[in-house]
Amino acid sequence: MARNKINNETNILADNEDNLPIPRVLPSNVQAEQMLLGAILTNNELLNYVSEFLRDEHFFEPIHQKIYKAIEKITEKGLTATPITLRSMLTQDELFQEVEGAEYLAKLITMSMMVINPLDYGKIIYDLAIKRNLINIGEEVVNNAYNSSLEVEAKEQIEHAEAKLYDLASEGLNEKSFTKIGISISESLASINRAMKNNDHIIGISTGLIDLDNKLCGFHNSDLIILAGRPSMGKTAFAINLALNACNNMRLKNIRDNQEIQSVGFFSLEMSSEQLTTRLLSMCAEIDSTSLRTGILGEEKYNRLRKEANTLSELQFFIDDTPALSISAIRTRARRMKRKHNLGILFIDYLQLIRGVSKSENRVSEISEITQGLKAIAKELNIPVIALSQLSRAVELREDKKPMLSDLRESGTIEQDADIVMFIYREEYYLTRKEPAAGDAKHAAWLDKLNKVYNIADIIVAKHRNGPVGNVPLYYDSQFSKFGNLETRTFNSN
């Protein structure tokens, strides 16, 4: 026989010189389907062994899909599924009549006599269904590549295909059943023991800021944390500080516990990776960003810059600055990072720049889809997800500028899905814009008030699903965009 080859014009697999198409049949095992259905009809208890992973659409034959679904409906009502009860439910169905349903059910019962382990048959049916879905995805990928317009980039098609493949690979794996309380207690005790052994008693990923850690106990796996603030409050700067601290603290913890080093992922939808790394360099080397942009540096500053650049280059810190990503693209890329680089924590700057998948005209619905997607990523990958968010302009219309939960844009869904909501607020920013004239009697009082809030940023924990809320004042060095502990005015030293 001649070797297989592809006909380029028709994309049909051929196995001879005449390019005759090879008839290919979708993978299935009709006999296994018949034997399993017969066994379940003989003993309804067997349904419990396969129903957790096997659904009606996993069957290849349409009549078998209908029979399995009917069995599920009957047993859900507390009744016994038998050929007689099935016949009364399906008697008006055209397909059931076409296969002479009564006789066919009797045939299934007869075939069940040869069934030894029904679970094996269920797994065979499930596995073949996955393979058929894999074929469908492959065909869709090919068709989309042939028929795509210039508006759809190849990279977007790859991510779409990757997402479908990942969902297929994960099918059935994320469906958790009841867990015995003893197992949950063991997991809780293990977390408590880890906290007791840690000198800082932090269970989650340390923020590198003592007072904030005392309030939050670090960032916890599967949590969605929203960090919100008005422009110029320092949202991105604070997020960069948290990300760098997390990267260093995870590394130390991983080394101590002899674990694989975890990485930080940072989706920067607004700033370029170069702008973000320039901020990091400014922060770590303590060189103002203007000097870095203009290149006006003395030898001492330049040597300091090179040293910090070398240190940062060794970190497991990954930046994706692709603009206008969809929530599905973020999920796909986060999964890839988890697989390739052991992603430990994810930052997104910022929420309102993410595109929804459904392209709803209702922005509140779209934000709801996005926040639910981010929470799903946190749970699926078992990592903390920190998403930055804008606040509405209503803050600027009030005398008291301190933000509240109602100030969140599309606040209902964000507040609902988040485990923690934090606001960043700098009273110094607003006071400097209200300076009275130098000779004014109010100037002295204004100056006294300004001195009290100088270089202070308040982190307002407005929602904390598993802990206390309240205000955490931090030291803020505006020149280098560094956040530290207020009492000691020190920064994370890792």
From Swiss-Prot:
GO cellular component, one term: primosome complex
EC annotation from Swiss-Prot or TrEMBL: 5.6.2.3
A family per Pfam: DnaB_C
Reaction(s) catalysed (UniProt annotation): Couples ATP hydrolysis with the unwinding of duplex DNA at the replication fork by translocating in the 5'-3' direction. This creates two antiparallel DNA single strands (ssDNA). The leading ssDNA polymer is the template for DNA polymerase III holoenzyme which synthesizes a continuous strand; ATP + H2O = ADP + phosphate + H(+)
Binding-site residues for ATP, renumbered to this chain: 229-236
GO molecular function: ATP binding; ATP hydrolysis activity; DNA binding; DNA helicase activity
Keywords: ATP-binding, DNA replication, DNA-binding, Helicase, Hydrolase, Isomerase, Nucleotide-binding, Primosome
InterPro entries, sorted: DNA_heli_DnaB-like_N_sf, DNA_helicase_DnaB, DNA_helicase_DnaB-like_C, DNA_helicase_DnaB-like_N, DNA_helicase_N/primase_C, P-loop_NTPase
Class in the EC hierarchy, top level: isomerase
Keyword Nucleotide-binding: yes
Span of domain SF4 helicase: 198-490
A Gene Ontology biological process term: DNA replication, synthesis of primer
Similarity annotation: Belongs to the helicase family. DnaB subfamily.
Subunit structure: Homohexamer.
NCBIfam families: DnaB, PRK09165.1
Record function comment: The main replicative DNA helicase, it participates in initiation and elongation during chromosome replication. Travels ahead of the DNA replisome, separating dsDNA into templates for DNA synthesis. A processive ATP-dependent 5'-3' DNA helicase it has DNA-dependent ATPase activity.
Protein name as annotated: Replicative DNA helicase DnaB
Lineage, highest ranks first: Bacteria, Pseudomonadati, Pseudomonadota, Alphaproteobacteria, Rickettsiales
